[in-house]
Amino acid sequence: MSLPKDLLYTEEHEWVKADDGSYIIGITDFAQDQLGDIVFVELPEVGDTVTKGDSIGSIESVKTVSDFYAPVTGKVVAVNETLEDEPELINSNPYDTGWILKLTEVEEADVTALLSSDDYEKGLD
């Protein structure tokens, strides 16, 4: 299982990456593996304000449909529109081309509450 050390994680299997004043968000390799082949992604709208812990979309696979939760509070400034036609990018590259959304105006307390890769990995055992 791939687990980049430079990302932060949630117990719900989302990852967060600081990116020059904004934060890129996706689901972990573990999560995509558990879901199986992803066939559809419901994305939030650009301009939406999302609240940590709230469902902000869904990911549909051949096995199930799973809600996607906001790991931090912030404003959606971009979504990965490529996922509309190629949702399988989450399976093939969850930490790069399979990113889901980008937030700004993120509450710093939410970021500091996220898990390091080591702490996230311990929770998988």
Swiss-Prot record:
Its cofactor is (R)-lipoate. Belongs to the GcvH family. GO terms for biological process: glycine decarboxylation via glycine cleavage system. Keywords: Lipoyl. The modification N6-lipoyllysine is found at K63. GO terms for cellular component: cytosol; glycine cleavage complex. This is Glycine cleavage system H protein. The glycine cleavage system catalyzes the degradation of glycine. The H protein shuttles the methylamine group of glycine from the P protein to the T protein. PANTHER family: GLYCINE CLEAVAGE SYSTEM H PROTEIN (PTHR11715), GLYCINE CLEAVAGE SYSTEM H PROTEIN-RELATED (PTHR11715:SF3). It comes from Listeria welshimeri serovar 6b (strain ATCC 35897 / DSM 20650 / CCUG 15529 / CIP 8149 / NCTC 11857 / SLCC 5334 / V8). The gene is gcvH. The keyword Magnesium does not apply. Binds 1 lipoyl cofactor covalently.
